[in-house]
């Protein structure tokens, strides 16, 4: 059910009616297009395939098997019902001790056992969305700003800004060096903010990167840590994709750098955001973590955690699961293998029709380069192409402009939130759209021919303030149904 009218918006707060910081972006519009016409192999085979959802569904069978073997871990079983009354009562808002210990051990495991984490510094939140907002509330005041390398996760504009009132200042990264962040670019963004009298409180890094699927190397992390320390600003590292690395180089956590640089840096300025949504494929469990090396931040975040607690039943179940070292080791190994296999299958399918992706080693998505399909090298052309992909090809992929990418023609496409059959259907649709001429057993991509077809079309879009494309067949408002980004808030 959707709500079409907003007759009483004038009696609401500015926060409630501020569309600038909500979900008015092609990223969320793609979700709504999927909500209106979701693909189903039998019920709706011509519907929109959801490739805008960074969800890891490749290892559900492993978790299901563990639950079958450990029925006592859930109060929803005959064996576990005896724990119902104790779990149903109020618990310590700081979290069950066994849960925080299990989380700390799991964080160590996902970082190769190269660092240790203190359970007393583990603060719960309602998913990484809640964890990110919590850390911003702890570090900044309304009007303050954080630097963030672009392209970056689109919902940061909602999650980090909407209620906190902070600003995000993009640090432009481009394809000339495979979108790698440089200290020079960080310095320029910082100095420009200073000239504009904007108070910069910190730098936010997503490592591994969403949407690039790449990891930051040790030297880069050291340089960025040095920069933030020199300017006495915070370094917030969003590491929610830590265990999605499926190829070299390995993931390096900022915690490792701190161990190397203990005598040279101020740990009080460093904070980690983590969750189980990506690494375990459990976004519905809403487990987010703030881990700070600053005592005052830990204390403040704990007080704020009452606004977004993790249910005791969830803590109880996960404490048991994550304490099973044999299961965790097998899960992480198998997850990496399956992600590598799916990534290779998908990118090979794209390469067969001449579509390249940024070389990546982590994440649940690819950074797809569709620049050869643009009518012109403009963001208007990017949006026109996106509109056709949504409405005609029936794939929800996310345009680079929604990630604040500085170059038109890049798209994030997710590959781990569907079964093998759906992936192949998506690839078939892409193959049909791009067009392939077959000569014997060889396939010859004809991207340039498709580009010429685009030039014949008068498909242009002028950005509105909302970046909203009216030609996408959507209702003005969509209900927060289970597929909606209003529900799946951390993608």
Swiss-Prot record:
Entry keyword annotation includes Protein biosynthesis: no
Cofactor requirements of the protein: pyridoxal 5'-phosphate
GO molecular function: 1-aminocyclopropane-1-carboxylate synthase activity; pyridoxal phosphate binding; transaminase activity
Keyword S-adenosyl-L-methionine found: yes
Associated pathway: Alkene biosynthesis; ethylene biosynthesis via S-adenosyl-L-methionine; ethylene from S-adenosyl-L-methionine: step 1/2
Reactions accelerated catalytically: S-adenosyl-L-methionine = 1-aminocyclopropane-1-carboxylate + S-methyl-5'-thioadenosine + H(+)
Pfam families: Aminotran_1_2
Entry EC no(s): 4.4.1.14
GO biological process terms, semicolon-separated: amino acid metabolic process; ethylene biosynthetic process; fruit ripening
Keywords recorded for this protein, A-Z: Ethylene biosynthesis, Fruit ripening, Lyase, Pyridoxal phosphate, S-adenosyl-L-methionine
TM annotation in the entry: none
Modified residues (N6-(pyridoxal phosphate)lysine): 278
InterPro entries from the UniProt entry: Aminotransferase_I/II_large (IPR004839), Ethylene_sulfur-biosynth (IPR050478), NHTrfase_class1_PyrdxlP-BS (IPR004838), PyrdxlP-dep_Trfase (IPR015424), PyrdxlP-dep_Trfase_major (IPR015421), PyrdxlP-dep_Trfase_small (IPR015422)
Subunit field text: Homodimer.
Biological role stated in the UniProt entry: Catalyzes the formation of 1-aminocyclopropane-1-carboxylate, a direct precursor of ethylene in higher plants.
PANTHER family xref list: 1-AMINOCYCLOPROPANE-1-CARBOXYLATE SYNTHASE-LIKE PROTEIN 1 (PTHR43795:SF74), BIFUNCTIONAL ASPARTATE AMINOTRANSFERASE AND GLUTAMATE/ASPARTATE-PREPHENATE AMINOTRANSFERASE-RELATED (PTHR43795)
UniProt similarity note: Belongs to the class-I pyridoxal-phosphate-dependent aminotransferase family.
Protein name as it appears in the record: 1-aminocyclopropane-1-carboxylate synthase
Organism: Nicotiana tabacum (Common tobacco)
């Amino acid at each position: 059910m959707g709500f079409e009218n907003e007759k009483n918006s004038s009696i609401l707060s500015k926060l409630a009616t501020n569309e600038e910081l909500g979900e008015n972006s092609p990223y969320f519009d793609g979700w709504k297009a999927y909500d209106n016409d979701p693909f189903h192999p039998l019920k709706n085979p011509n519907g929109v395939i959801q490739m805008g959802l960074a969800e890891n569904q490749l290892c559900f069978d492993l978790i299901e098997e563990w639950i079958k073997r450990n029925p006592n871990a859930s109060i929803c079983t005959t064996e576990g019902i005896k724990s119902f009354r104790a779990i149903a009562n109020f618990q310590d808002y700081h979290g069950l001790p066994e849960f925080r210990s299990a989380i700390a051990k799991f964080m160590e495991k996902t970082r190769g056992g190269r660092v240790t984490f203190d359970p007393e510094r583990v603060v719960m939140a309602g998913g990484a969305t809640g964890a990110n907002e919590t850390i911003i509330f702890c570090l900044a005041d309304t009007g303050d700003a954080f630097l963030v390398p672009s392209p970056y996760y689109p919902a940061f504009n909602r999650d980090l800004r909407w209620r906190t009132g902070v600003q995000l200042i993009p640090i432009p990264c481009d394809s000339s060096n495979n979108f790698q962040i440089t200290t020079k670019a960080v310095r320029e963004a910082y100095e420009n903010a200073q000239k504009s009298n904007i108070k910069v409180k910190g730098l936010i890094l997503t490592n591994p990167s969403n949407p690039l699927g790449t990891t930051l190397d040790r030297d880069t992390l050291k340089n960025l840590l040095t920069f933030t320390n020199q300017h006495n600003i915070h370094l917030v590292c969003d590491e929610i994709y830590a265990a999605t690395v499926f190829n070299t180089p390995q993931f390096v956590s900022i915690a490792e750098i701190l161990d190397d640089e203990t005598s040279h840096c101020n740990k009080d300025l460093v904070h980690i955001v983590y969750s189980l949504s990506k690494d375990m494929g459990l976004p519905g469990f809403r487990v987010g973590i703030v881990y700070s090396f600053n005592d005052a931040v830990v204390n403040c975040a704990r007080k704020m955690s009452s606004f977004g607690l993790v249910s005791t039943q969830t803590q109880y179940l996960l404490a048991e699961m994550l304490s099973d070292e044999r299961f965790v080791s097998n899960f992480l190994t198998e997850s990496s293998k399956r992600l590598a296999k799916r990534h290779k299958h998908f990118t090979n399918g794209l390469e067969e029709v001449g579509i390249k992706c940024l070389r990546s080693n982590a994440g649940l998505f690819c950074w797809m380069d569709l620049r050869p399909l643009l009518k012109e090298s403009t963001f208007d052309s990017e949006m026109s192409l996106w509109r056709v992909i949504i409405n005609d090809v029936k794939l929800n992929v996310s345009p680079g402009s929604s990630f604040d990418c500085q170059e038109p023609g890049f798209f994030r496409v997710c590959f781990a939130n569907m079964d093998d059959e759906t992936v192949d259907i998506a690839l078939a649709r892409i193959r049909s759209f791009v067009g392939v001429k077959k000569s014997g057993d060889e396939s010859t991509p004809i991207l340039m021919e498709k580009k010429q077809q685009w030039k014949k079309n008068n498909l242009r879009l002028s950005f509105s303030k909302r970046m909203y494309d009216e030609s996408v067949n959507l209702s003005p408002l969509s209900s927060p149904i289970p597929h909606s980004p209003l529900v799946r808030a951390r993608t």
